[in-house]
Amino acid sequence: MGVWGRRGGVVAGVLVAGVAVTGCGSVDVAGAPVEREVFAFQGRELVVDSVGSDLVVGAGDVEDVRVERQVDGWGVGGSGPEARWELVDGRLRIRVECDGIASGCGAVHRVLVPRDVAVSVTGEDGDVAVEGFATAVKVRSDNGDVRVSKVSGALDIGSDNGDVRAEDGLGSGEVVVRSDNGDVRLSFGVVPRRVDVAGDNGDLTVTLPRAEYEVSGSSGNGDRNIDVPVREGSGRKVSLRSDNGDVTVRTAN
């Protein structure tokens, strides 16, 4: 069933953070109570803005926005973890904060969105996973990995510090990825029209179905490996640029 269960329910235990903190305490998000909230929503695009939590965003057969969270933590000389969520004017705002002289927090939020809604996701200090959208998806991540699966709408990803993975039969016709620090791996299940990937520090790998592509690949400090049929003027354009890392374009078979 993947990240999301039948009837639009959210499957617990997916992308759960569990952080051990030596000497003072431990964080057990998987064992934390599950809290649930349903937010009324009408619109064509949902903005998800998360700080301090891992995040799973998926599309389902629902008419509203459904959120589950698990939060755990500890604090010395403070209040421990404080979690807040609200949906106002099309923006779902998620915050998890630790307060204290010494503290440790961990959290995961799972967000279920109507299938016909596009999403724009911003994650800070946490991993981001997005699954199951046929609509446009935009992801911005600051300090966390990004994982995308079963997405067929236009895809736009920006990552400041973390790996980017879209390897489960990516169906998007147009994909743009910008990465400051981390590897990027894209694996397509359909022939895309446009792929544009640029990275400052990390390997870039794109796996494509067999077809002819117009390919541009360059690296300031790394190997360049182009192993797909290449034809100038093809309507299918692939561009990879890395300042410091290998650049690879290859066929799936």
Label the model's feature ranges.
Residues 47, 56, 82-84, 110, ...:
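Short, surface-exposed charged micro-motifs
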Residues 2-77, 99-106, 110, 223-234:
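Short acidic/polar N-terminal linker immediately downstream of export determinants
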Residues 44, 65, 117, 213-215:
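Short beta-strand/loop motifs in extracellular/secreted proteins, especially
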Residues 59, 68, 78-79, 103-108, ...:
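A short, polar/proline- and glycine-enriched secondary-structure boundary/capping micro-motif
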Residues 22-26, 47-53, 75-79, 113-115, ...:
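Short low-complexity stretches enriched in small and charged residues
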Residues 166-253:
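Short, surface-exposed interaction patches in beta-rich subdomains
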Residues 41, 50-52, 87-89, 123, ...:
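A generic beta-sheet turn/junction motif
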Residues 35-39, 80-153, 164-166, 185-187, ...:
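Right-handed parallel beta-helix
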